[in-house]
Amino acid sequence: MSSGALTKPQMRGLLAKRLRFHIVGAFAVSLGVAAFYKFAVAEPRKKAYADFYRNYDSMKDFEEMRKAGIFQSAK
């Protein structure tokens, strides 16, 4: 047993160090997911709604539904 003395492991601040690392990682992942959702889902949806309502004629749609007999009060 002539091996040198083993160095003691650091026991203080392990939780704080680990939490700091994981909080930074979680923040980066959440920003990435938010950016992905904005550009992959929200922007195309907003564009689709804008395209639809740009050419939408509510009176024409109302007249088609009235002729189909959907409304009871508008005959």
From Swiss-Prot:
Residues exposed to the Mitochondrial intermembrane side: 55-75
Membrane topology: Single-pass membrane protein
Subcellular location: Mitochondrion inner membrane
Pathway entry: Energy metabolism; oxidative phosphorylation
Listed InterPro entries: Cytochrome_c_oxidase_VIc (IPR051389), Cytochrome_c_oxidase_VIc/VIIs (IPR034884), Cytochrome_c_oxidase_VIc_sf (IPR037169)
Gene3D superfamilies: Mitochondrial cytochrome c oxidase subunit VIc/VIIs
Membrane topology (Mitochondrial matrix): 1-13
Record field: transmembrane: 14-54
Statement: the UniProt record of this protein carries the keyword Transmembrane helix: yes
Protein keywords: Membrane, Mitochondrion, Mitochondrion inner membrane, Transmembrane, Transmembrane helix
GO biological process, one term: oxidative phosphorylation
Top-level taxon: Eukaryota
Gene Ontology cellular-component terms listed: mitochondrial inner membrane
Function (record text): Component of the cytochrome c oxidase, the last enzyme in the mitochondrial electron transport chain which drives oxidative phosphorylation. The respiratory chain contains 3 multisubunit complexes succinate dehydrogenase (complex II, CII), ubiquinol-cytochrome c oxidoreductase (cytochrome b-c1 complex, complex III, CIII) and cytochrome c oxidase (complex IV, CIV), that cooperate to transfer electrons derived from NADH and succinate to molecular oxygen, creating an electrochemical gradient over the inner membrane that drives transmembrane transport and the ATP synthase.
UniProt record similarity statement: Belongs to the cytochrome c oxidase subunit 6c family.
Subunit structure: Component of the cytochrome c oxidase (complex IV, CIV), a multisubunit enzyme composed of 14 subunits. The complex is composed of a catalytic core of 3 subunits MT-CO1, MT-CO2 and MT-CO3, encoded in the mitochondrial DNA, and 11 supernumerary subunits COX4I, COX5A, COX5B, COX6A, COX6B, COX6C, COX7A, COX7B, COX7C, COX8 and NDUFA4, which are encoded in the nuclear genome.
Name of this chain's protein: Cytochrome c oxidase subunit 6C
Species in which this protein is naturally found: Carlito syrichta
